């Protein structure tokens, strides 16, 4: 669903209980992120599977390594008690969705209004992470999705 999401203070939302993905019509760039939340949920919490562990570890390591170079204001937010602190970014479902975005934007080089990562630090640069993301998401989107009765996603 495309709609105005002003009161939610988010450009996109995924509601698992309603099986509904909502994207703010004024800012469609969160679509791919929310799409990967939906895939994660609909296919049985893929982000919690053992096969996703290496990506989780690489993401956190890369994030922490790059965090050292961030401004004090951003570090303060990440270390604070706001909704968008480091615990938020380290939730496995968030890592899954962000790595799905990495797959589309960095690996496949997709350029679209439906995918524009907004917080650069939330998408850490790492060759090892990119390679793990490439391997995992290629398998997911070309082999596993068709096995669930869904068409290939790429």
Positions of predicted regions on the chain:
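Active-site-flanking segments in enzyme catalytic domains
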Residues: 1-154
């Amino acid at each position: 669903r495309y709609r105005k999401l002003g009161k939610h203070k988010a450009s996109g939302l995924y509601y698992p209980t309603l099986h509904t993905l909502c994207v703010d019509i004024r800012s469609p760039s969160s679509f791919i992120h929310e799409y990967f939340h939906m895939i994660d949920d609909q296919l049985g919490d893929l982000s919690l599977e053992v096969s996703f562990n290496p990506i989780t570890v690489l993401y956190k390591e890369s994030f922490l390594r790059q965090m050292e170079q961030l401004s004090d204001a951003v570090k303060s937010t990440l270390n604070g008690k706001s909704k968008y602190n480091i615990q938020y970014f380290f939730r496995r479902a968030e890592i899954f969705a962000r790595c799905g975005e990495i797959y589309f934007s960095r690996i496949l080089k997709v350029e679209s209004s439906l995918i524009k990562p907004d917080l650069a630090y939330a998408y850490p640069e790492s060759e090892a992470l990119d390679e793990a993301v490439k391997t995992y998401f290629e398998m997911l989107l070309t082999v596993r999705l068709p096995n669930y009765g869904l068409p290939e996603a790429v």
